[in-house]
Amino acid sequence: MIKLIKTATIATSGEMALAEAIKRVAVIGAGAMGHGIAQVFAMAGFEVSLLDIKDEFLKNAMEKIRWSLNKFAEKRRIKPEDVDKILARIKTTTSYEVAAKDIDLAVECVPENMDLKKKVFAQLDQLAPSRALLTSNTSTLSITEMASATKRPDKVAGLHFFNPPQMMPLVEVIKGDKTSDETVSTLVSICKKIGKTPIIVKKDVRGFVVNRVLGAVFVEAFWTLHRGEATKEAIDASVKYDGGFPMGWFELADFVGLDIVAETGLVMYKAYGERFKPCPEVIEPLVKAGKLGQKTGAGFYDWSKGRPAIPFALAGQYDVDRSWAVAVNEAAWLVYEDVATPADIDTGMKLGTGWPSGPCEYADKKGIDVIYNKLASLYNKYKMEFYNPCPLLEDYVKKGWLGKKTKRGFYTY
């Protein structure tokens, strides 16, 4: 049996005490993520102020929240009479003064632009009570830099929900350079109170946990396609039908949006260099042509008639262990750099992306020596940094920590 305590949605009495102090929440930005996050907090009993720059944006957001709540009622996840009660907990406004008044927590959900986010944080810092925690739902940008726009960097952190927030169980809690342990503990307890599973990102690194591991897998798949070693359909069929993943990598990229995948890829390349070397030949022509995936009806696949059919017959034409190897390698870097624990990484990948296993537990089951040798072989063949084994994996192999078969790997058995 694995000797570890998984992050869970059950809060301890100490955590509950921290969460109890949080009553009023401001959500800044009523777009897809913002209105979903506002709904999540309102469903958990919090009073919510939802802010955007135009009343029409707010009206649209409230209509979407009502639609979503009605769906919850249809599926008997809430009582029909609760719909109006939940909606009544959300007040909309275009005024920062109104939104920030007497709040205990703010969640910023504006577009991924650092200058814009810093302006939001500066305003919140000026107007919100000194006790209030200020958080960002960013998926790529620096929490530390946002905190620099405030006089309370100890109370600033990342609170990264996954899309759609009403349905996805995971939240990444990101610690900036000056974020206090109490702030992190409070946010962890709040996540549990709203029915989410939090994982702690101990350092303010680009991509946090989930997008970093996912980014490594995308890079490997894009280069494999570019080298002509497998078609996108063959890669996706193998990943889905042999690997048990919910989507193939190209299908997933289309679902996320190729503009977002390309933009995030550049952020990762800037942060980590050759380990995230982008493959512009694969993605740039599509982005330039406006083929951004599902949202535009075309990307790697044609989405005009719904989700593309990935032929089962093509499974087996791509070695899925290549995907696993680079995922394990990036997970090892996260552990090596003390960004996250193996348990939180595994929880993140399973709950944030629907993976059949976390990379650390997969490596322990497969054999860390097997993964290490796979990476070393690929690195010797291609001389590309994303195959270069992390020093942690080399260290584990030298120590004989090979996973389940030796009772010690990422976990102790």
Model region roles, listed by residue range:
Residues 2-413:
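N-terminal glycine-rich phosphate-binding loop for ADP-containing cofactors
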